[in-house]
Amino acid sequence: MIMEAINLEKIKTQMRKGVLEMCILSIIHKKKEAYASDIMEALKEADMIVVEGTLYPLMTRLKNASLLNYSWRESTEGPPRKYYTLTDKGLSFLNEALASWNELQTMITKLI
């Protein structure tokens, strides 16, 4: 019984990881631009809790893949902030990911 619970948690974690990039890109696209705490807040509101130690390396990976750009802006609340925007490649990737997500949902719905 305990082994089943461990496997279920592992499966749930893997499913979240599998869609996290798509969710982050979607948040940035909806907001037009987003600061890291905006992204974390949106994920939290959707009950997708992500820690900074997960988010920042992922953002770097998306930037290195040319899916995101960023710019620094002064902040009245402290140090300058890094704001992210989607590149054209990022938007294309997001659209393809969303199409794949919709196909997957359709397939799963037929099975359950």
Where would I find each of the regions flagged by the language model?
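A cross-family signal for key residues in well-ordered alpha-helices
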Residues: 23-26, 41, 60, 95, ...
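Basic amphipathic alpha-helical segments that dock to polyanions
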Residues: 55-57, 61-62
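Beta-hairpin "wing" of winged helix-turn-helix
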Residues: 65-79
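Amphipathic alpha-helical dimerization/coiled-coil segments
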Residues: 91-112
